[in-house]
């Protein structure tokens, strides 16, 4: 009989010393993105301009991370948000201008599809590890806990509780207010995570009664389910980008190129375990794919 005792240990105890700070990853991702996507033979192209503006939003994220770490630097926080809002406004204008462009030649990446596949696989593995050991979003943990509460209630008691009470719980725990369907997105992962952790505790004779098993395993269930949901969200985004390019443009290599660019964005690594960011992006993307 195989016991999944590995799930009861923090991932940072398994992968000791695996840590890349934001400045290092910012530098490496910038260098890789420029080397792969920048057209050095045609510098004055719209693609190069888009790449520069896309990567140019990364310092704003770093400013926000530093301001959150210090909790005192209000200037960095304000400057970071102004930078992000300005960059978002530029991309809104850019998308509105895109249908008016008559000539948009396709420019291939500076690496062949085989190398792009190897690089994308390595980056996806790195992103999964970061989501497994990095800081998890409080909204994801709160959603998993609410999903667990739903699973423990009977159908009659669940139907009697209005949805605004769930929103109040999320707002109390995270400071944000989500809709009543937010825990449902995490329930698919919360159910097997609950069964996996509780069965492991029972098999190891950590606790005896079922009720005590649930109480002991609840924090571990929330962490595992939130991280697993974030990982599945990233995988859904990768496959969505590839399939969107294949179905809408008939170019599988283009989808692979876009997916690797997503994996190179420092933002994806900075908040790898934030389900409130990843799931929203995955749902928006798949609404375009289908």
State what each model feature region is.
Residues 2-134:
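Membrane-embedded, hydrophobic transmembrane alpha-helices
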């Amino acid at each position: 009989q195989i016991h999944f005792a590995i799930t009861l240990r923090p991932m940072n105890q398994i992968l000791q010393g695996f840590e890349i700070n934001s400045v290092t990853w910012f530098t490496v991702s910038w260098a890789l993105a420029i080397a792969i996507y920048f057209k050095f033979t045609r510098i004055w192209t719209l693609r190069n301009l888009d790449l520069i503006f896309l990567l140019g939003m990364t310092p704003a994220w770093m400013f926000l991370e530093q301001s959150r770490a210090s909790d005192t630097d209000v200037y960095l926080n304000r400057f970071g948000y102004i930078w992000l809002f300005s960059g978002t406004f530029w991309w809104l204008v850019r998308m509105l201008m895109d249908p008016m462009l008559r000539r948009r030649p396709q420019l291939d990446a500076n690496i062949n599809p085989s190398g792009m596949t190897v690089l994308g696989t390595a980056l996806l593995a790195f992103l999964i590890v970061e989501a497994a050991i990095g800081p998890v979003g409080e909204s994801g943990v709160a959603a998993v806990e609410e999903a667990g509460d739903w699973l423990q209630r009977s159908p009659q008691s669940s139907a009697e509780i209005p949805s605004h009470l769930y929103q109040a719980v999320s707002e109390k725990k995270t400071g944000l207010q989500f809709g009543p369907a937010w825990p449902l997105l995490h329930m698919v992962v919360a159910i097997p995570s609950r069964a996996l952790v509780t069965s492991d505790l029972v098999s190891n004779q950590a606790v005896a009664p079922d009720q005590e098993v649930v109480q002991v395993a609840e924090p571990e269930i929330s962490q595992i389910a939130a991280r697993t949901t974030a990982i599945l969200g990233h995988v859904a985004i990768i496959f969505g980008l590839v399939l969107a390019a294949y179905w809408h443009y008939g170019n599988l290599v283009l989808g692979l190129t876009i997916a690797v660019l997503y994996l190179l964005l420092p933002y994806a690594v900075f908040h790898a375990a934030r389900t409130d960011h990843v799931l929203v992006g995955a749902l928006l993307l798949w609404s375009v794919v289908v």
